[in-house]
């Protein structure tokens, strides 16, 4: 074996006939780095003596004709071996490239025994907050040269640049941090940890201006904000100072916010999505506010993070205005708990890699918000152990730098505070002063209805509770205590079995009482059970709930069963609000129907409503399939066949396709049919959670994604330039749903029609939101195919069609003609 030069790297990328062990190499790209300089490149095609699949041809652009002229691997093996045998072997996913190349070289008589370094794992550790670690995504974020992705030399060159960026970043980190990482670096694949050791030798000691060491952890120091700059009363000028152009309707929206500021009534402002509403309300309010704090509430933590990373960050940089985001304590890292895990032995390789990732992250984060770690869902058990519980000992080494405490205190004094709807409801329930005398903005205010409903519910994970109870049966407990554990476990398991076997979703008052009695008897015998596992169940029965039901979900590929409870009446949002300086409700849809508005459902009688007219979309169109059969008139099997056949034909257009379902059963039925014809696709729950299948879809693993639930209104497709969205059915709510029944009863009491005044307009709203999932930025083009014939045949269909026509161009015709038009539209 040749002597390896630890300062010389061979960065290798292979293209092959597949991703399996029996694959043949079809292209080799090698970049040699010496003394942190690219000194040589090498590339060659290789004749595999077998035809390529359509997938590989599409992915790489390599053709059979091209490879027919290429040399056999035996003709290039010696040159490749001598080029890389004295180097450290580096690749992005090194296991595949190194194993495949070593095997092919071995068959030609060359034994490759070089150290192996994986840039995927290095990137995960040293760029801890990225959403993805594909070479393409890293190239976008780090501005690597990847002009011809999935050709071997282009990928190898980009990986070489990535390696140099990684080395530069590692060597810039405090020497004390790298010393902390060294004991964990053996958990990295193969010899990847050697780069941590090399960087440690070159790194400098910690700069006390930028970092502080507390209790053995290296933390980033927060920098003081300069004096606040006063905003102009000219919206366009403020936008220009931010380096942005104000749009005409955005300026009008900002003027509406300004004009209504002195009104004592709550302002309901309606404006089309994509208008730039966030700057439209932030800039005028920051200019008008004197000493009042501005609180902006959004529906999700994701949107909260987006505002902090974009609009709030820019405003803070330009105007030196203090901006703070706050969530519940469980979103933040507890440094005491994390530090304890660093000394824990026996954790697996990937958990130890996450510890490295978090140690690096602590030198970057100013918030300690674990949502900054985008891939933590893979190890939720570990992250549960290190998240904050809201409590902090006075003796804690980290008392003065605790992220949750710091965030809580900063939130009291910041000029602009960003929260989410759920946090607002939880907070003001016990602390009205939190929002009193302040300026409130509820963005996407229509989501407050559902947030109120979720707030009025409690849920308990029955699967986990039964597992914990049965685990304690093995302990040495008194006989009576064991009998009570068995009784509670039996009651819960019995109800869950009826739910799965007989579809008994709802729990009777008698059954709920039996569970409550069993839980309270166990608690009365031994109060320790509250803290062992009964906290959630006892809290659920402590509320005046009248409705109980079961739900199931898949989490980390495992089925979880939940017992839910709620009251039978809608909560009145107005009762939550303290007396504020000013409150705005902002949404793209405030009027649900001519008879029902969002203000009505939230309990407001006195309010001021203003709106801006909508523009029609030109880069998104809707086609309605005239030939699609009505599901009510055919069997489930025939319905699934009809959808699958259309998906198969649309796939010939070679564009990304999102297919939305109302029913999980229909989604799985269609998936089975696509499997039968070997049409590769991804299906929510079958192939992972909504988050995971979306990530795989955007990574290019498949051109077809079947989804339901979150894909209707909570998942955006920003990265796709062109997309086809297939909506299989109109999204009417299930009339048996308890929340829908509450709304119906509320409207009937006011002599209004639950269908015409709520279910129908809500379906239109949900339909518009679904259509908007694939149209989230300029320069996107999206074709929407609606497969529900009720829009053409039912009396309410014209109402839906007219509502969509306000914003979109619509045509209805035979499927074959729609397919041709969609193809031309997306060119």
Provide a role label for each language-model segment:
Residues 234, 292, 301-414:
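A substrate-engagement module of RecA-like helicase motors
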Residues 262-283:
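Walker A/P-loop
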Residues 88-95, 99-104, 134-196, 784-786:
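Acidic, Mg2+-coordinating catalytic module of metal-dependent nucleases/exonucleases
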Residues 1-4, 165-235:
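Acidic two-metal-ion nuclease catalytic site recognized across multiple nuclease folds
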Residues 390-416, 421-526, 590-602, 736:
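Signature of the SF2 helicase/ATPase Hel1-core->accessory helical subdomain module
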Residues 627-635, 689-788:
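Conserved RecA-like P-loop NTPase helicase motor core
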Residues 391-412, 431, 522-634, 708:
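A contiguous, basic/glycine-rich beta-loop/short-helix subdomain that forms a polymer-engagement track
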Residues 2-114, 128, 132-146, 150:
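Conserved non-catalytic scaffold segment of RNase H-like nuclease domains
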């Amino acid at each position: 074996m040749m002597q390896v030069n630890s300062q010389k790297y061979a960065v290798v990328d292979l293209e092959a006939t597949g991703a399996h062990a029996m694959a043949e190499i079809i292209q080799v790209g090698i970049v040699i780095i010496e003394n942190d300089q690219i000194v040589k490149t090498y590339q060659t095609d290789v004749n595999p003596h077998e035809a390529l699949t359509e997938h590989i041809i599409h992915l790489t652009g390599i053709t059979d004709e091209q490879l027919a002229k290429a040399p056999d691997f035996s003709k290039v093996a010696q040159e490749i071996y001598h080029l890389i045998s004295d180097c450290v072997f580096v690749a992005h996913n090194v296991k595949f490239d190194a194993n495949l190349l070593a095997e092919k070289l071995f068959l030609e008589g060359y034994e490759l025994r070089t150290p192996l370094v994986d840039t995927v794992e290095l990137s995960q550790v040293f760029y801890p907050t990225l959403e993805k670690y594909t070479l393409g995504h890293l190239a976008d974020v780090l501005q690597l040269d990847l002009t011809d992705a999935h050709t071997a030399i282009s990928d190898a060159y980009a990986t070489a640049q990535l390696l140099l960026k990684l080395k530069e970043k590692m060597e810039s980190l405090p020497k004390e941090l790298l010393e902390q990482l060294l004991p964990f670096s053996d958990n990295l694949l193969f010899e990847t940890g050697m780069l941590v050791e090399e960087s440690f030798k070159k790194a400098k000691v910690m700069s006390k201006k930028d970092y502080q060491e507390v209790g053995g952890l290296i933390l980033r120091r927060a920098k003081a904000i300069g004096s606040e700059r006063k905003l102009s009363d000219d919206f366009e000028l403020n936008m220009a100072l931010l380096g942005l152009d104000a749009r005409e309707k955005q300026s009008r929206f900002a003027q509406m916010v300004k004009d209504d500021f002195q009104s004592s009534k709550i302002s309901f402002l309606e404006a089309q999505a994509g208008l730039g509403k966030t700057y439209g309300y932030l800039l005028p309010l920051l200019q008008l506010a004197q000493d009042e704090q501005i609180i902006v509430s959004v529906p999700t933590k994701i949107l909260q993070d987006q505002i902090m990373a974009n609009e709030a960050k820019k405003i803070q940089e330009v105007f030196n205005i203090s901006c703070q985001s706050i969530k519940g304590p469980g979103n933040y890292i507890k440094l005491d708990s994390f530090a304890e895990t660093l000394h824990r032995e026996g954790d697996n390789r990937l958990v130890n890699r996450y510890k490295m990732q978090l140690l690096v992250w602590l030198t970057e984060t100013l918030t300690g918000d674990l949502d900054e770690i985008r891939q933590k869902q893979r190890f939720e058990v570990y992250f549960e152990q290190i998240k904050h519980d809201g409590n902090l000992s006075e003796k804690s080494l980290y008392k003065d730098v605790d992220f949750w405490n710091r965030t809580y205190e900063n939130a009291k004094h910041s000029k602009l505070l960003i929260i989410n709807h759920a946090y607002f409801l939880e907070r003001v329930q016990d602390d009205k002063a939190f929002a009193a005398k302040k300026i409130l903005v509820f963005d996407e205010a229509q989501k407050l209805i559902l947030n109120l409903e979720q707030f009025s519910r409690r849920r308990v994970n029955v699967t986990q509770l039964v597992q914990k109870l049965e685990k304690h049966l093995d302990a040495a407990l008194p006989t009576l205590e064991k009998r009570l554990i068995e009784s509670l476990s039996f009651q819960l398991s019995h109800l869950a079995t009826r739910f799965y076997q007989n579809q008994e979703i709802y729990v009777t008052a008698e059954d709920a009482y039996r569970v409550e009695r069993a839980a309270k008897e166990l608690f009365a015998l031994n109060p320790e059970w509250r803290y062992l596992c009964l906290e959630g169940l006892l809290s659920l029965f402590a509320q005046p709930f009248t409705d109980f039901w079961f739900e199931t979900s898949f989490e980390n590929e495992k089925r979880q069963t939940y017992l839910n409870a709620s009251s039978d009446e809608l909560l009145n949002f107005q009762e939550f609000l303290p007396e504020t300086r000013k409150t705005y409700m902002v949404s793209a849809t405030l009027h649900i129907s001519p008879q029902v508005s969002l203000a009505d459902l939230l309990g407001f009688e006195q309010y001021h409503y203003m709106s801006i007219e909508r523009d029609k979309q030109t880069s998104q169109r809707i086609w309605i399939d005239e030939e699609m059969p009505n599901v009510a008139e055919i069997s489930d099997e025939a319905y699934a066949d009809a959808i699958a056949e259309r998906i198969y034909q649309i796939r010939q257009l070679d564009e990304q396709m999102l297919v939305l379902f109302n029913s999980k059963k229909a989604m799985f039925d269609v998936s089975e049919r696509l499997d039968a014809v070997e049409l590769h696709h991804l299906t929510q729950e079958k192939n992972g959670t909504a988050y995971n299948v979306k990530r795989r879809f955007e990574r290019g693993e498949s051109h077809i994604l079947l989804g339901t639930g979150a894909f209707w209104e909570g998942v955006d497709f920003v990265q796709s330039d062109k997309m086809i969205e297939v909506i299989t059915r109109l999204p009417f709510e299930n009339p048996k749903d308890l929340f829908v029944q509450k709304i119906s009863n509320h409207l009937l009491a006011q002599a209004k029609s639950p269908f015409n005044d709520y279910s129908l307009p809500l379906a239109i709203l949900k339909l518009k939101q679904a259509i908007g999932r694939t149209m989230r930025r300029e320069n996107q083009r999206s074709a929407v195919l609606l497969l529900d014939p009720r829009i053409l045949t039912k009396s309410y269909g014209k109402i839906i069609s007219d509502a969509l026509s306000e914003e979109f161009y619509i045509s209805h015709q035979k499927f074959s003609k729609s397919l041709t038009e969609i193809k031309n539209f997306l060119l």
